[in-house]
């Protein structure tokens, strides 16, 4: 078998692996207490029913971890609890990300400086579904994801589609049948208007790139070793 045919076969197999991983990661991935405490990748919310996604259905009532609309308690005010998804615990005992949480008095987590985004940074999006606040800084928690949130895991969700003059969602999120931006089956499934909608696997690559830590090169190398 030639090197060219081996590489071609490896790439074909890798593409199939990526497609399967995307569907599993964003359509049926379970988390939280329903799956041994598993954390969703890239700050996706784990819903009360144990599924990964973004939007009110996942980040609202009962949200177990991730970019939950209500900040979880932590630190000395939360019985010594640490934050999920490597978020910071603020001096007041709330989980989030950004200077209000990771700055002065931060109790645990990756204390760090703010990342600029949005209209004050040439439209830059925040990494890992973090919210871009109305002031143009990346973070998680009500100060970033609440009023004026420009992109990311905003609470409440941004409106889109025919219910919002044809607007599309930022971050390539899905626009649900009801006109709300988010990720997961409730947004990308039946009736999805735009974004990475589930259509027999079509459109999944963009969601995979934004929300799943999978290296295409790594898969190529791994598969090549098997052929």
UniProtKB/Swiss-Prot annotation:
Source superkingdom:
Eukaryota
Keywords from the UniProt entry: Chitin-binding, Disulfide bond, Glycoprotein, Lectin, Pyrrolidone carboxylic acid, Repeat, Signal
Gene Ontology MF terms in the entry: carbohydrate binding; chitin binding
Which residues lie in the propeptide? Answer: 202-227
Q: Which residues form a coiled coil?
A: none
Gene3D superfamilies listed in its UniProt record: Endochitinase-like
Pyrrolidone carboxylic acid modification, residue list? 29
The record lists substrate as bound by 38-40, 90-101, 142-143
Q: Which residues are glycosylated?
A: 211
The record's section on InterPro entries has: Chitin-bd_1 (IPR001002), Chitin-binding_1_CS (IPR018371), Endochitinase-like_sf (IPR036861)
Q: Which cysteines are joined by disulfide bonds?
A: 31-46, 40-52, 45-59, 63-68, 74-89, 83-95, 88-102, 106-111, 117-132, 126-138, 131-145, 149-154, 160-175, 169-181, 174-188, 192-197
Matching entries from PROSITE patterns are given as: CHIT_BIND_I_1, CHIT_BIND_I_2
Q: Where is the signal peptide?
A: 1-28
| Tissue specificity statement from the Swiss-Prot or TrEMBL entry | Confined to root caps, several cell layers at the periphery of the coleorhiza and radicle, and in all cell layers of the coleoptile.
In what residue span(s) does the Chitin-binding type-1 domain sit?
29-70, 71-113, 114-156, 157-199
Protein function = N-acetyl-D-glucosamine binding lectin.
Name it: Lectin
